[in-house]
Amino acid sequence: MTISAQQQAVEEDLVERVLASFDSCENPRLKLVMKSLTVHLHDFIRDVRLTEEEWNYAIDFLTKVGHITDDKRQEFVLLSDTLGASMQTIAVNNEAYEDATEATVFGPFFVDDAPLVQNGDDIAFGAVGQPAWVEGTVKDTEGNPIPNARIEVWECDEDGLYDVQYADERSAGRAHLYSDENGEYHFWGLTPVPYPIPHDGPVGQMLQAVGRSPVRCAHLHFMVTAPEKRTLVTHIFVEGDPQLEIGDSVFGVKDSLIKKFVEQPAGTATPDGRDVGDQTWARTRFDIVLAPGNV
């Protein structure tokens, strides 16, 4: 499509007038962000020659995203995640540093007041699934163990649901614990399974319209904090999960985070002597390396 010089001048004049409206902003960072957003937004509108009908549809879509969002469901997080915006923001704010563990998306299902457990305890709290023994260390990039690092963990059950998705307000499949004096940690959880993100709302409709899967690869969430260290938000994924080939709906997978969950035959002795009955169980190891807080 050829755009006349006169039309281009009209469009460019509007951009300049909108940019000038931010000149009196006293916050330099806010001014930078708003001007950059304006340039890119107007470039997008002009690039695709957006119709008024399409723009009104987009406004209605965002309105629906807001309406379905509540204290248990954050549709805007899902939108950010499925467009890759969450992962891009993580990438620019978590620059690779030596061998520090890579970060990935936070997700919408974190809860602040997860129960405290001790090393060796079970975070499932009645959630159903294959038991999994998870162990590892927390160290700095020089190889020194980090004692007393706070480790938040959360995951779905075998039906692909988090506790907050149930109506009974249960607390299951989540907890926090601390690394011991040697920087070691271990706990029982569940072997992660793939699950669809909530797709009965506008974000799900978007994914369906463009032919994308709403399914997340099987994963276990971690958030690890320690004094003077960069906070780590990450997952571990399950080697051999078929969804890895299809793709993660929020682009969260990194090769370094794919771990073996080695299935143990029923009756195999557990590391801590726990009786898991006549079912199989799995074990995995995730050694965590935290970057310095000033990088």
UniProtKB/Swiss-Prot annotation:
Catalyzed reaction equations: benzene-1,2,4-triol + O2 = maleylacetate + 2 H(+)
Any Gene Ontology biological process: catechol-containing compound metabolic process
Gene3D superfamilies per record: Aromatic compound dioxygenase
Pfam families per the UniProt record, alphabetical: Dioxygenase_C (PF00775), Dioxygenase_N (PF04444)
SUPFAM superfamilies for the chain: Aromatic compound dioxygenase (SSF49482)
Family label: Belongs to the intradiol ring-cleavage dioxygenase family.
This protein's name: Hydroxyquinol 1,2-dioxygenase
Cofactor(s) of this protein: Fe(3+)
Organism the protein comes from: Corynebacterium glutamicum (strain ATCC 13032 / DSM 20300 / JCM 1318 / BCRC 11384 / CCUG 27702 / LMG 3730 / NBRC 12168 / NCIMB 10025 / NRRL B-2784 / 534)
Keywords: Dioxygenase, Iron, Metal-binding, Oxidoreductase
InterPro entries: Catechol_dOase_N, Intradiol_dOase_C, Intradiol_dOase_core, Intradiol_RC_Dioxygenase
Pathway linked to the protein: Aromatic compound metabolism
Molecular functions per Gene Ontology: 4-hydroxycatechol 1,2-dioxygenase activity; catechol 1,2-dioxygenase activity; ferric iron binding
